[in-house]
Amino acid sequence: MISFAEGLLYGILEEAFPGDLAHCIGDTSEIEVHLEKAINDFKIETFDSIKSGIKEIGIIVQAIPSLLKDCKIEENDLKKLAEMAVIFTHPLTLALRVGKNILVNGVDIYDKISKGLTLYQSADYNGSGRQFGMALAEVFLKTSS
């Protein structure tokens, strides 16, 4: 799942991770559990299942900073991850932010989620992570109108 994590970071941070995650990232079993749940949610393709899948990917985002503790990561990138992770600790804020950005601000993440799912099913985990990361960045890092 290192490849997925690299892709997810790339999608969120809009740049490749500087270095080799395989040599500095910790145990990825938590990522694997939540990723499988997210993939199953995304396959259902309803608004609620997409929200649930985003929540599962968010749990992965919350876990990433502790997994990266031995990695060299820029302060600004860590700040983006922390900002996004905080939202996932407040379920009401999460639901409001996702709903508002998808419905009010017109954030269209369906194509990214769909492409991420297709890439995951074809074992392109890096590409899949990148698509999910870009979808998260659209929802959580997009400036509200």
Segments and roles (model prediction):
Residues 1-145:
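Mature extracellular/luminal domains of secreted and GPI-anchored eukaryotic proteins, especially small
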